[in-house]
Amino acid sequence: VTETLLDLKGLKCPLPVLKTRKALTRLNTGDQLTVLTTDPMAEIDIPHFCQENGHELLAAEKLEGGHRFQLAKGG
């Protein structure tokens, strides 16, 4: 399992979801992606993106000034 960090701090909707989608295309099923974002909409958008596209949301954490999401690429 590969673990990748994607720092999207400072980007606004819809860029965090678009860049997350692009990063996941380069990973294999089961690989993990950690996404850091400061966009308040990501709290809704990233979990919804995972649910709609078959990826697993392993963790969602509210940080000071943003969020950290840990995803596993679905098959």
Name each model-derived stretch.
Residues V1-D7:
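Right-handed parallel beta-helix/beta-solenoid
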Residues E3, Q32, G66-R68:
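A generic structural signal for beta-strand entry/edge sites
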Residues L8, L15-E56:
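Amphipathic, hydrophobic secondary-structure cores in small proteins
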Residues G10, V17-K19, G66, L71:
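Intrinsically disordered, low-complexity sequence elements enriched in Ser/Thr/Gly/Pro
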Residues P47-G75:
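C-terminal structural segments of small proteins and small subunits
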